[in-house]
């Protein structure tokens, strides 16, 4: 089922439906827009018919210079079975040739009072958000000191309990159990909760709790950009865990690589505090302060000094 249809644009941007009502359920499959200026001149070889078409003042002013036959020919070519809609901006008068072509082809003809540039920007942002690649990850997403921390790990390792402790310490829950993730651009992943389980947290032995009801509206968020992944796993004595923090592990979600930290779980370890420190340390690294690197440099300097003596 298409994520976006023409009728969604009409409702979202309060567009006036001039004609082509039978086509308002046409799907929109791309966030790219088209301003058919060169098509107005008669070049339709590479016409992107599957895009939303925007007709601004420039296009319609040039259109007025054409002959009557050219006007009819261009507008018929503009309205295809693939075209989701044509939007006339600035509340300009709709050419009668376009109105006729819209009625014959069933292409929705819409009108907006906004400028072409402004409407183009808003349409692009809206469509990119709706049509972005998505996936779902089993885990918990928490906003810790402004860092979107995705906590993953096998079932029963203590993800929800750790999230509860973080919420109790003043941080904000975004999603528990299932995190819906969409890629808004090349390096931006935004996580949110499915509507059915929004603001809910499942604690084994306690059941399902409503975080917003218990801790208030300040304890939850609807969505958050994900920048750090914490992987919880049962402590394995035969595995060598990172003790310096020099080697940075990565995890790929959709097309974006995120920093991943593996935390071994064993009795007595306060995971909530460790995750808080991991989030703060991550922010420091992004600001150029790397404690592990500084220690390594000091160690190498001490070794070199010792060798000289």
UniProtKB/Swiss-Prot annotation:
Homohexamer. It comes from the Bacteria. One of its GO terms (biological process) is regulation of carbohydrate metabolic process. It comes from Bacillus cytotoxicus (strain DSM 22905 / CIP 110041 / 391-98 / NVH 391-98). InterPro entries: HPr(Ser)_kin/Pase, Hpr_kin/Pase_C, Hpr_kin/Pase_Hpr_N, P-loop_NTPase, Ser_kin/Pase_Hpr-like_N_sf. Residues 201-210 are annotated as: Important for the catalytic mechanism of both phosphorylation and dephosphorylation. Its cofactor is Mg(2+). The gene is hprK. It catalyses: [HPr protein]-L-serine + ATP = [HPr protein]-O-phospho-L-serine + ADP + H(+); [HPr protein]-O-phospho-L-serine + phosphate + H(+) = [HPr protein]-L-serine + diphosphate. ATP binds at residues 153-160. Keywords: ATP-binding, Carbohydrate metabolism, Kinase, Magnesium, Metal-binding, Multifunctional enzyme, Nucleotide-binding, Serine/threonine-protein kinase, Transferase. Residues 264-269 are annotated as: Important for the catalytic mechanism of dephosphorylation. The Walker A ATP-binding motif also binds Pi and PPi. Its EC number is 2.7.11.-, 2.7.4.-. Both phosphorylation and phosphorolysis are carried out by the same active site and suggest a common mechanism for both reactions. One of its GO terms (molecular function) is magnesium ion binding. SUPFAM superfamilies: HprK N-terminal domain-like (SSF75138), PEP carboxykinase-like (SSF53795). The active site is at 138, 159, 177 (proton acceptor), 243. The keyword Zinc-finger does not apply. Mg(2+) binds at residues 160, 202. Disulfide bonds: none annotated. This is HPr kinase/phosphorylase. Catalyzes the ATP- as well as the pyrophosphate-dependent phosphorylation of a specific serine residue in HPr, a phosphocarrier protein of the phosphoenolpyruvate-dependent sugar phosphotransferase system (PTS). HprK/P also catalyzes the pyrophosphate-producing, inorganic phosphate-dependent dephosphorylation (phosphorolysis) of seryl-phosphorylated HPr (P-Ser-HPr). Belongs to the HPrK/P family.
